[in-house]
Amino acid sequence: VLIPDELDNARRLAFAGDEAGARDLLLSLIPHIEREDRDDLMLEVLAQLGEIYLDRGVNDGVRESIRRIQDCVAIYAGMPADAHSTHLVRRYSRRAQFLQAGLAAAIGDHDGAATALAALEDRGADLPRLAQEHARLRIHARVLCAIALCDDDLHTQSVPLWEKVVSDLNDYRDTGEDADHARVVAGIGYGKFCVDTGRLAEADPWLRRAEARARANGWELAMARAQLERAAARWAANDHAGTEQLVSEAYPVIARHARTHDIARCWLYLGLTRLGSGALEAADECWEHAERHWRELGKPLYLHRILLQRSWIAIFWSRFADAVELIAQARELLDSSPRSSWLQYALLDSHLGTVWRADALADLGFDSSGDPDETLQETEARQAEGLGILHGEIGTDEYWRGMTKLQQAAELKVPAALAVDSVRYSIADADARARWAATVSGPVLAGAFAVAWEWENTELISELVEYHSARGTFDTGPQRPQTGEWASTATAPVPVETDLEPVPALAASGPSAPGGASLTRLGPLPPLRMQPDAEPILSHYRELAAQRYGRDVTAAEPAWSTWR
């Protein structure tokens, strides 16, 4: 047996996504290596096994690999130094540090991952033969740490890591399968980050290059993962057909390789495309599969999103108690997660307000409201035939019941909308501010306006209009694609340009500089008063936003008079 050749074969199998085959081959080599008493080859086996276990989420296997590598390296480090021992200690110390960084990231210990990554960053005098491997390990470790941050919705904290990844890739000159694999992993990871944060134009070339490089090497799993991220981008761009095509191509490969998290994401997007064509029952079946897979993995943030997404089926079916129960389960998951943020709670409250709004519209005779006693197929037909009009009569018991429910919807949606929008003008970059408005605050504010209008609350409508007029946010520019609120419940872009901690917006949030010529003010506005003898507008809802989410919707300054 030519052990070095077999080690190369094992690495090729791992790159191709056949971790089981690679693991079995590596384990079969151990008796031969022990007979030859080659510690350097045994260390390579342990390092490769650790990477396989890391990729498959077998954390105990990663820990054992790290322990055995460190034990062997410690023995050589205590011997008199020579070229062989120096090379061995330097190389496999780094391989162990890489595994430590990846393991800490995988279990959500982001501080530990940062510490391990800093150790791997050691740029002291390097051995020429190890320089390119060291660069590759740094790139790969940063990608793993950044992906783990994004999985915990900590996209803002991942930005410095992604910036270093992009910079290092520009300087990375190595060739061969190892180098190609590093570029593919980084391309898919960074492309997904760009999709998650709404930078679709930047994501596309990264994902296409990663897919092309994976295809050239025959790595079908990497190709499928790139296709899945491209599908997510297509959905964000409102291209339902493109999403369906890419997910359908990616899913069989991802399922064959048993990548549970990506399988769940495939089912999520398949369900979205089904709902986009009005197939409620098919969408619910897809999301049921996604929920099951995320429960198996124990991913609370993903699970909370799929529960919110599944609640739309109950909303369309007019089974509002079921929808409220799903949202309550999602709230419990946020409560149990150390990574939850005020923004997630605000969006959840806004969605709960949507349930109250839908319940109210059913009382008001909305022609597309479902019947909880009918089948989903009958609800699908009702949705297809509906004209979006109300048949109820003013003054009836049903009418007043609906008005009460709309009031409750406003109690949820308006404070959430004000809290979310309070972030927008703390963002100094105009493009980033526009992304936040289009993908985060805009849809939530639209829901608040809709409830105020349907509630026939002219005072609230006028105050919301005044709030927007003071911000100068009405325009006649290009409109975002027309799509239902359901389309982004589980796939909304995640902002990275602002801090989501429950504190007032800090970026340029003080008083305006005197004498400035700009008509646009960053940070919260002072309270707005529409009439001399009235309280500042939206006072009740601003107080709720502060109580629930810790957001200061207005600045601590004298009120502006808007009637002058």
Predicted ranges, named:
Residues 9, 42, 49, 93, ...:
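Structural register within alpha-helical repeat arrays
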Residues 261, 269-275, 279-281, 287-564:
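Alpha-helical solenoid repeat scaffolds used for protein-protein interaction
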Residues 17, 37, 57-60, 108, ...:
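Residue-level detector of the short coil/turn that links helix A to helix B
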Residues 4, 42-46, 88-91, 95, ...:
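Residue register of alpha-helical TPR repeats
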Residues 4-15, 28, 40-58, 91-106, ...:
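Non-membrane alpha-helical segments in proteins
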Residues 22, 62-65, 113, 158, ...:
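Single-residue signature of alpha-solenoid repeat helices
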Residues 13, 33, 46, 53, ...:
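Residue at a conserved register position within TPR or TPR-like alpha-solenoid repeats
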